[in-house]
């Protein structure tokens, strides 16, 4: 399925609107792989992945973007982190039961969406918007109006295809050079509402665009690959341990005999016993393939 896990950008030759189409199904499956989330949380994480991937296309520099949902409901946190290379990871944290079909409001309660853009060079930007919409799409559209004053429409779908998790979506946005030209967006949004999850999950981008916009002149650009990437490593885990006060390390070792660091994103475990800790204190470098001894 070569068209999967790709981000496509496109422009309309005669309309002041830009578009994006993404299928991130394999990446979505990888994010869910080591977790047993309720169905409603799985679906929300898929939408959040699609949304964050679409947002990475707006980055005009090397850097990261994080879209985070947090609230006082049973779903305390849902977050997706991506970068300009469309390398993605994500996780959710729950306290309490979440029924199938639960709405955004039921899951998060009184919540906010925090979008953080961190360039490798320059200042970090953070935007916060209350989760007042019925869907994640509604909340993101409100964010674009609030932060960039650009009317935007999002179409996001999650589900299964051939027994595997599937996540895909589309974005339409008025070009910044013509922010008041809402008629073009309204026209194209009406056409785009006819797209089905099955089409986005299974068809190449050019075929989807032809089915939707065959009366329009569309320029489709080269796709960008999307992939799951977790930045954890034994070395980073060792550095985190060495940042703890020595007394706290001793207490952990005395209590447990060893320290097991678990990565919520990818499910990896990094085990450090007393020999490892003593070697790290002596300046040894952790072996990425295993323990120090």
Swiss-Prot record:
Disulfide bonds join 230-232, 263-266. It comes from the Bacteria. GO terms for biological process: protein refolding. Belongs to the HSP33 family. CDD domains: Hsp33. The keyword Metal-binding does not apply. One of its GO terms (molecular function) is protein folding chaperone. Under oxidizing conditions two disulfide bonds are formed involving the reactive cysteines. Under reducing conditions zinc is bound to the reactive cysteines and the protein is inactive. PANTHER family: 33 KDA CHAPERONIN. GO terms for cellular component: cytoplasm. Redox regulated molecular chaperone. Protects both thermally unfolding and oxidatively damaged proteins from irreversible aggregation. Plays an important role in the bacterial defense system toward oxidative stress. Keywords: Chaperone, Cytoplasm, Disulfide bond, Redox-active center, Zinc. It comes from Edwardsiella ictaluri (strain 93-146). This is 33 kDa chaperonin. It is found in: Cytoplasm.
């Amino acid at each position: 399925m070569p068209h999967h896990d790709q981000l496509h950008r496109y422009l309309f030759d005669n309309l002041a609107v830009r578009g994006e189409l993404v299928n991130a199904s394999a990446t979505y499956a990888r994010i869910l792989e080591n977790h047993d989330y309720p169905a409603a949380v799985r679906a929300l994480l898929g939408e959040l992945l699609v949304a964050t991937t679409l947002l990475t296309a707006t980055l005009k520099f090397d850097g990261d973007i994080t879209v985070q949902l947090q609230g006082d409901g049973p779903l305390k946190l849902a977050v997706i982190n991506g970068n300009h290379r469309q390398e993605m990871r994500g996780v959710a944290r729950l306290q309490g039961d979440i029924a199938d079909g639960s709405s955004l409001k039921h899951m998060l309660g009184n919540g906010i969406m925090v979008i953080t853009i961190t360039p490798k060079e320059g200042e970090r930007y953070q935007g916060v918007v209350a989760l007042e919409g019925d869907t994640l799409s509604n909340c993101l559209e409100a964010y674009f109006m609030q932060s960039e004053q650009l009317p935007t429409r999002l179409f996001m779908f999650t589900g299964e295809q051939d027994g595997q998790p599937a996540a895909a979506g589309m974005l339409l946005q008025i070009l910044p050079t013509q922010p008041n030209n809402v008629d073009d967006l309204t026209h194209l949004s009406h056409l785009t509402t006819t797209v089905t999850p099955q089409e986005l999950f299974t068809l190449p981008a050019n075929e989807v665009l032809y089915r939707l916009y065959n009366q329009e002149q569309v320029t489709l650009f080269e796709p960008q690959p999307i992939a799951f990437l977790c930045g954890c490593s034994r070395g980073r885990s060792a550095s985190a341990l060495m940042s703890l006060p020595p007394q706290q390390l001793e207490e952990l070792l005395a209590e447990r005999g060893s320290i097991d660091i678990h990565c919520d994103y990818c499910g990896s475990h990094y085990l450090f016993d007393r020999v490892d800790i003593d070697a790290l204190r002596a300046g040894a470098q952790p072996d990425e393939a295993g323990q120090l001894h």
